[in-house]
């Protein structure tokens, strides 16, 4: 079929896709969407970038588009999507494994209310360095062809940039997402090359 979107097996190079014309047609269609993609992608060029990137990841471009945001003129990806990209495309035997360490009792639910410049209220994490001491997560996965898992430990206190209210609502989840991204940047950086989140 002329307009079928097909990615090559190596998933490494946009130039290896067999139907660029199909991608361009899909991008034009996406750009006309009223509710299924965010407003910052209402143009063919950005939609084409999403289509090409989605093909490389083996994902639905409309789903990927919903997990993007625009910050200071740069297109970013939500942490949930980045974690999914890693689990789907990293050369690992199984999904990333997480082990939380430390006493989180003084961190989870420890929030305070703040007011934005526009007058909107939101909650932020209110834990102190003493509360966060020892709290962290270990993320690990075994690479294909290896028997020993590769690990990375990220402590909550190491995270100084917490740009999302989710750091207050669900700090364990946010730390796990960030640890997964750091693990991938260390052990298989090509999988998320050029992918940035709000924490960066």
PLM region spans:
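Polyanion-binding surfaces on beta-sheet-dominated domains and ring/shell assemblies
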Residues: 2-200
């Amino acid at each position: 079929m002329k307009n079928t979107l097909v990615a090559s097996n190596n998933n490494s190079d946009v130039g290896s896709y067999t139907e660029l014309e199909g991608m361009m047609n899909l991008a034009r269609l996406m750009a006309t969407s009223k509710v299924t993609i965010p407003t910052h992608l209402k143009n063919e060029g950005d939609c084409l970038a999403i289509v090409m990137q989605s093909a490389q990841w083996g994902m639905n471009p409309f789903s990927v588009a919903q997990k993007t945001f625009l910050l200071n003129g740069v297109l970013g990806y939500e942490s949930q999507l980045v974690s999914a990209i890693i689990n789907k495309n990293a050369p690992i035997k199984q999904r990333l494994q997480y082990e939380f360490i430390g006493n989180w009792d003084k961190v989870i639910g420890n929030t305070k209310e703040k007011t934005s410049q526009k007058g909107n209220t939101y909650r932020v994490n209110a834990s102190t360095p003493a509360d966060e001491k020892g709290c962290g997560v270990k993320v690990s996965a075994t690479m294909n062809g290896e028997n020993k898992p590769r690990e990375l430990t990220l402590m909550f206190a190491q995270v100084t940039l917490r740009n999302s209210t989710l750091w207050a609502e669900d700090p364990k989840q946010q730390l796990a997402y960030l640890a997964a991204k750091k693990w991938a940047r260390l052990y298989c950086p090509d999988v998320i090359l050029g992918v940035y989140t709000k924490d960066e």
